[in-house]
Amino acid sequence: MAINLYKTSTPSTRNGAVDSQVKSNPRNNLIYGQHHCGKGRNARGIITVRHRGGGHKRLYRKIDFRRNAKDIYGRIVTIEYDPNRNAYICLIHYGDGEKRYILHPRGAIIGDTIVSGTEVPIKMGNALPLTDMPLGTAIHNIEITLGKGGQLARAAGAVAKLIAKEGKSATLKLPSGEVRLISKNCSATVGQVGNVGVNQKSLGRAGSKCWLGKRPVVRGVVMNPVDHPHGGGEGRAPIGRKKPVTPWGYPALGRRTRKRKKYSETLILRRRSK
């Protein structure tokens, strides 16, 4: 991804660093509208997730996470911007006439061919089961449950690594540093998700953040006691507690929130690093 820096005519352009423009002209049969999606409110209009709201209207693009068009070659026709994720997407024209969107693999260009199946080449963008991949392969869009579609390593720049295969399971090292077991029959896509430099962007102004549907974040220490446990005091005061807490009084910043009896607890060999 190319980062554009503009001449300093206004404060917003002086501090901004945005990616090069990738146009989006989605196909009508691969999109649908969403009503109040991502606004952080429930059915009664009550805020359930803070710091969300507003933003530009979006159309959801149907992404093929399953990659179940087996042994049918497809060609990358366009690389488009998707407002619902930080990764780009590709429009694929398959040999049987079907058209689908997939996540854009890093390095893929218009005109490249991809295929999914059991005995396909280990090539960027191809999807195949983990049992057919050599050790050390970089992968993304990884299935957890067979046939459900990819659920792991789907963000921009995400990449996992196949480090071992034993019995019915394969050992993966995920982008978070977690090492876990997954069935060897689950499929994944070879390569890394594109738009790697997304974390180098700087929006430059608050208005650009509002367009994305992100509301301002206010520190609890500057609130009143009625609004946050950290609030109150004369002037710039400390939080008045040994450890920070959430707005509802629960421990924050370091408290483990994962359920101990979750079914996948035995599949995680090493916990993710913070």
UniProtKB/Swiss-Prot annotation:
Residues 1-22, 225-274 are annotated as: Disordered. GO terms for cellular component: chloroplast; mitochondrial large ribosomal subunit. It is found in: Plastid, Chloroplast. Residues 1-15 have a biased composition (Polar residues). Transmembrane segments: none annotated. Pfam families: Ribosomal_L2, Ribosomal_L2_C. GO terms for molecular function: rRNA binding; structural constituent of ribosome; transferase activity. SUPFAM superfamilies: Nucleic acid-binding proteins, Translation proteins SH3-like domain. Coiled coil: none annotated. GO terms for biological process: mitochondrial translation. Keywords: Chloroplast, Plastid, Ribonucleoprotein, Ribosomal protein. PANTHER family: LARGE RIBOSOMAL SUBUNIT PROTEIN UL2M, RIBOSOMAL PROTEIN L2. Part of the 50S ribosomal subunit. Belongs to the universal ribosomal protein uL2 family. This is Large ribosomal subunit protein uL2cz/uL2cy. It comes from Lobularia maritima.
